């Protein structure tokens, strides 16, 4: 595995954004967006001249995204909220209905965002591993501080 500094949150966002092409730049570790509305000549040239440098980030499938909501539902303890969300997932438009139903439960909505973010980050790390890429270790803010009794340089 090759270590690379990557913004895991950007990668998670790319995995959760169907219909828009995202690539991982294998040299810089940056997640790049290719937009049909605002073409980027530099990115287009990179795709044409150095395609091996860019790795397409396939977004989660509809089944995976729906599974994420179903997994979250198992965490819901309040019976009325559970029933409302379960019905939403059985509707014709489960994504829209699920998110609309969550609006009725502000605390649960926050729980959903936390749960979704955690799971997307896990999927991002799995995606990196599947592609033989190791995220470089990040230093915690406290590890950047000098030892006690030593002044900042």
Curated annotation (Swiss-Prot):
Domain of life: Bacteria
A UniProt-annotated Pfam family: UPF0158
InterPro entries the UniProt entry points to: UPF0158
Species: Pseudomonas aeruginosa (strain ATCC 15692 / DSM 22644 / CIP 104116 / JCM 14847 / LMG 12228 / 1C / PRS 101 / PAO1)
Family per record: Belongs to the UPF0158 family.
Protein name per Swiss-Prot or TrEMBL: UPF0158 protein PA5073
């Amino acid at each position: 595995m090759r270590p690379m500094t990557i913004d895991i949150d950007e990668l998670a966002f790319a995995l959760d954004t169907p219909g828009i092409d995202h690539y991982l730049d294998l040299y810089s570790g940056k997640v790049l967006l290719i937009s049909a509305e605002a073409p980027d000549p530099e990115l287009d040239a990179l795709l044409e001249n150095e395609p091996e440098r860019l790795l397409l980030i396939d977004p989660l499938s509809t089944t995976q995204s729906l599974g994420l909501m179903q997994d979250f539902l198992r965490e819901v303890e309040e019976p009325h909220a559970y029933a409302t969300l379960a019905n939403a997932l059985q509707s014709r438009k489960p994504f829209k209905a699920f998110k609309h139903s969550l609006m009725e439960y502000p605390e649960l909505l926050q729980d959903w965002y936390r749960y979704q973010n955690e799971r997307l980050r896990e999927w991002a790390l799995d995606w990196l591993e599947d592609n033989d890429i190791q995220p470089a270790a990040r230093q915690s803010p406290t590890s950047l501080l000098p030892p006690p009794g030593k002044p900042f340089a």
